[in-house]
Every structure is written in structure tokens, then in C-alpha cells.
Amino acid sequence: MAMDGAAIAKGAEGSVYLSTYLGRDAVTKVRTPKGYRVPELDRRIRTQRIRSEARLIREARAAGIRTPIIYDVDTVECSITMERVKGVTVKRYLDEHPEEAERICRLIGTNIARLHNSKICHGDLTTSNMILTPAGELCIIDFSMGASLIGVEDMGVDLRLLERGFTSAHPDIKDAYGYITEAYCREKTGAQEVLDKVQEIKDRGRYT
């Protein structure tokens, strides 16, 4: 694996670099060391989290979700090297093609339902963490905030955060969340319980 220079994305937990792996275009995500932690503890935490993220990506893929193919997990460098997915973020696509909102939102709802049916939550469902490929597939990326073996509360939080993020990123797209939940209900076992939990979260004011 060889990285190609400056980071293309930076977050609180890590940075993403363009790279190559055995001649294939790739991206490498490196977990950032935290100077305020004891070095041994910091390495242990970063190693656990990089392994967890890789496992979630693989589990999501096994559940029928389009995710990047993982090429390598380096527990020394605390990095994941994975497929460089071709396409554009859903955020950019909807900004440029708002007339496609209903179709894309239904695609989002179906894929989230498949995640939740497999007891996986993403933890940061935004249209910036979804890529629309040239083949029309929805690829979900960045599972760094995700978890598995989840309950209804986690699923409700996933949907609530998506609703808030969608409203903020795409305020001019009407009925978006409705399209998402309609598709979600068709695919998700026990969907109404999750939607009831979303309403409960709203009523509690927990994420408002």
C-alpha cells in the first residue's frame, strides 16, 4: 500500500488519503493518535476501533449493502485500506439533480432497512457518507461511529440523525424523509416499532 500525499478528508477520529494497493486505486483511512491519552492505551483504543470499523463494513456488505471492498487492515499503523469507490456523494448528486430526490430517498430507506435488519447501525447517516456509483448503486461509507448487535433505540437514533441531517443539508427537498421511511417500512422487519422510537426520541428532545 502506498499513500499519495495530502489527506482528502479529515475528521475528529482520523484522516483519509488517496492510495494504491497492489496496483489498484484505493483510499486509506488512518486513525489519528490522541496526545492526551497514555500511548499504550491510545494504541489499544485505535486498534480496537479500526478493527471494529472493518468488521462493520464487512458485515454490512454481507447483508447486501454496497460498501467499499476492504483490501488491508493494518493494526500497527491503525489504518484500513479499501476500494476507491467511483461516483459522487449523494449530497452533491441531490444538489445537482433535485428532481431525482424521490428515487434516491427510497434507495436510502431500503439500504438503511437492510442494515437494521442485520442489527447494524451506522451512527453517522448523512448524504455525505453515501456515494452514488455510475451503476446507480448506493454505497455507504464511514462506519467509524457504527455498532452491531443493536436494539430499537439505536435504530431510532440512526433515523432521527438522518432526518435532521437531511433537513439541514437539503432544506429545499420536500417529503424526503417520508420517501425514506416508506421504503424503510417495506424492507424492515418491525419497522413501526422503530418509527415509534424515532417519535419518542423527538418527544424527549434528546437530539433537538
Which role fits each region the language model picked out?
Residues 1-10, 23, 95, 99, ...:
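Regulatory N- and C-terminal appendages and interdomain linkers associated
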Residues 4-51:
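ATP-binding glycine-rich loop module of kinase domains
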Residues 46-50, 61, 65-108:
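Conserved structural core of kinase catalytic domains
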Residues 60, 111-115:
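Conserved hydrophobic alpha-helix
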Residues 117-127:
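Catalytic-loop of the protein kinase fold
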Residues 129-140:
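Conserved protein kinase catalytic/activation segment
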Residues 139-208:
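C-lobe/activation-segment region of protein kinase-like
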